[in-house]
């Protein structure tokens, strides 16, 4: 069956990349605007017992990722049938409506249900990745996907700061309405600025899920990349629950603990913002597989000394360097995925990858909390380093066996 995508030359992929970057930036801001005060909003909805507050805060945070993991393959299949632009529009508008409803919620059960619906309707960033990956020339895909990844990262960095200021100035509920407005701007911008020439595929002509993997050049490698994506998120998420407490252990009872913890939490994102396009471009030249394995090993070498630091400054420096390495990982994975998948199934492959990413977002904090409860904060970094090391070794073995990269570039 002929691919549903038109030749690359008929589309201004540079313009689409810029607009998709802006969309990912706005989506990153929108999602992170409400994150700093989620527990406060749960409390506002009537959950006041400290134990219950912790439980509900964890539930409303994780349920979005759980439902996103479930829904992503469905939306990916629909994207391969109907096009990626319509999925961007569906995601932006759907999330905008849900954010309005969240601001109107009157009970914790309503809020929990809406967080689940948010996960079901989300997916702007993976669909943007699929759109750009299928339009950009293959020899520029590492740079393009690396640059695109900085949109969501930079939005997520700015969002909590703006969200905190807005919540202090206007209250908690208005921030949800402001977030909805940001997502609606993303919808309008995508509607009028993104161009995609896509020939819809009849449902009867669509490949079934098991057939998708038969079209891949190296199915085993793709499965390894899915697991790598999950472990990247596990490694990131495992540290999140204990970071503030670890900083307090290192610094003592300082007055500006929240500021110092927030700074240390955000520096990896700043480093990733700087490194992702550069390492993506380097990957286009020397191969994304080398970048992936090298940066996984660098991550291991940085995680281990984090368990030995004596003050917050040392931790901050190591986390900045870790962010620079991590900034190359997901773009390298995405580049390898598009090398191995045809445009015909790209939407589903990226959606499966998103499902594994969501699973990592859920399991990472659980692993970090469990390890710290049994062996202390420092053990979290050691255990995480071991998990990443296993993934680096397995990825290296799998990537060594894959076909020559030049044959992957031949379409």
From Swiss-Prot:
GO CC, one annotated term: plasma membrane
Membrane topology: Multi-pass membrane protein
Entry annotated with the keyword rRNA-binding: no
SUPFAM superfamilies: MFS general substrate transporter
Localization in the cell: Cell inner membrane
Entry superkingdom: Bacteria
Gene3D superfamilies for this protein: MFS general substrate transporter like domains (1.20.1250.20)
Key words, A-Z: Cell inner membrane, Cell membrane, Membrane, Transmembrane, Transmembrane helix, Transport
Transmembrane segment boundaries: 17-37, 59-79, 92-112, 116-136, 147-167, 174-194, 222-242, 257-277, 291-311, 320-340, 379-399
Record keyword Zinc-finger present: no
Example GO molecular function: transmembrane transporter activity
Alphabetized NCBIfam families for the sequence: PRK09874.1
Entry's family note: Belongs to the major facilitator superfamily. DHA1 family. MdtG (TC 2.A.1.2.20) subfamily.
Protein name: Multidrug resistance protein MdtG
Native organism: Erwinia billingiae (strain Eb661)
Upper classification of the organism: Bacteria, Pseudomonadati, Pseudomonadota, Gammaproteobacteria, Enterobacterales
Gene: mdtG
């Amino acid at each position: 069956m002929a691919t549903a995508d038109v030749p690359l030359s008929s589309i201004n992929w540079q313009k689409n990349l810029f607009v998709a970057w802006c969309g990912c930036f706005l989506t990153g801001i929108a999602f992170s605007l409400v994150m700093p005060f989620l527990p406060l909003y749960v409390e506002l909805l009537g959950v006041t017992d400290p134990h219950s507050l912790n439980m509900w805060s964890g539930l409303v945070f994780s349920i979005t990722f759980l439902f996103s993991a479930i829904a992503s393959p469905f939306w990916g299949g629909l994207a391969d049938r109907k096009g990626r632009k319509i999925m961007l529009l569906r995601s932006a508008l759907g999330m905008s409506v849900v954010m309005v409803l969240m601001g109107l919620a009157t009970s914790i059960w309503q809020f929990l249900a809406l967080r689940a619906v948010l996960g079901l309707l989300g997916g702007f960033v993976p669909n943007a990745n699929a759109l750009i990956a299928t339009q950009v020339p293959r020899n520029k895909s590492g740079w393009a996907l690396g640059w695109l990844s900085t949109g969501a990262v930079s939005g997520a960095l700015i969002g909590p700061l703006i969200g905190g200021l807005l919540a202090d100035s206007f209250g908690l509920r208005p921030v949800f309405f402001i977030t909805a407005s940001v997502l609606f701007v993303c919808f309008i911008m995508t509607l009028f600025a993104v161009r995609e020439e896509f020939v819809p595929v009849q449902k009867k002509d669509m490949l079934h899920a098991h057939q998708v993997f038969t079209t891949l050049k190296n199915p085993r490698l793709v499965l390894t990349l899915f697991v790598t994506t999950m472990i990247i998120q596990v490694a990131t998420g495992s540290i999140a629950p204990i970071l503030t407490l670890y900083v307090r252990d290192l610094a003592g009872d300082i007055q500006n603990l929240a500021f110092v913890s927030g700074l240390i939490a955000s520096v990896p994102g700043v480093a990733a913002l700087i490194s992702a396009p550069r390492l993506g471009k380097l990957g286009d030249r020397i191969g994304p597989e080398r970048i992936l394995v090298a940066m996984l090993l660098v991550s291991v070498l940085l995680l281990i000394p984090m368990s030995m630091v004596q003050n917050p400054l040392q931790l901050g420096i190591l986390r900045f360097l870790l962010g620079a390495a991590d900034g190359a990982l997901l773009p390298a994975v995405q580049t390898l995925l598009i090398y191995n998948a045809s445009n015909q199934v790209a939407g589903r492959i990226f959606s499966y990858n998103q499902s594994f990413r969501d699973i990592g977002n859920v399991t990472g904090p659980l692993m970090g909390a469990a390890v710290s409860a049994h062996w202390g904060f420092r053990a979290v970094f050691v255990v995480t380093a071991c998990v990443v090391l296993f993934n680096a070794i397995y990825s290296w073995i799998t990537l060594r066996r894959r076909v020559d990269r030049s044959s992957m570039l031949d379409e």
